[in-house]
Amino acid sequence: MYQAIPYSSTRPWLRPEPAASVVDVVKVETTTAVAGRGGEAEVVGEEEAAEVRRAVAESPVLVVGRRGCCLIHVVKRLLQGLGVNPAVHEVAGEAALKGVVPAGGEAAALPAVFVGGKLLGGLDRLMAVHISGELVPILKKAGALWL
């Protein structure tokens, strides 16, 4: 339980340390973006791309999206409604998809849906395939549905 702190008019309140201001956060993000042109940031991007490649190979259905993106939830709920439990992998940006999508392939938009180790597309493509009735056979062929 929490212990109550007795009130004292003689003892001043200790002010908490100020949180990072928006300016500080923007400076950190800008520094990270500048550092991303070479060196360590590229190595982190390559590690993230390798993680995505491994996850695509392991999962019959994988949803790759940007951290904190609400569209991941939309894709996941659509697939769960069909009886599929997709794996979800959150990444920092679209650079993680470079090694997964073939060089001549279409550009991947996040969230990207991989079915059977192949890129199905983004949310718009998933909705189009679902509405046309082609999604269930694709999921069965990938082994994500057993019905």
From Swiss-Prot:
Binding site for [2Fe-2S] cluster: C69
Principal location class: cytoplasm
One Gene Ontology CC term in the entry: nucleus
Family of the protein in this entry: Belongs to the glutaredoxin family. CC-type subfamily.
Signal sequence segment: none
Protein name: Monothiol glutaredoxin-S5
SUPFAM superfamilies found in the cross-reference section: Thioredoxin-like (SSF52833)
Protein function: May only reduce GSH-thiol disulfides, but not protein disulfides.
Superkingdom, natural source: Eukaryota
InterPro entries recorded: GlrX-like_pln_2, Thioredoxin-like_sf
Domain (Glutaredoxin) ranges: 49-146
Keywords carried by this UniProt record: 2Fe-2S, Cytoplasm, Iron, Iron-sulfur, Metal-binding, Nucleus, Redox-active center
Taxonomic classification: Eukaryota, Viridiplantae, Streptophyta, Embryophyta, Tracheophyta
GO molecular function: 2 iron, 2 sulfur cluster binding; metal ion binding
Localization terms from the record: Cytoplasm; Nucleus
Protein source organism: Oryza sativa subsp. japonica (Rice)
Positions of short motif Responsive for interaction with TGA factors: 144-147
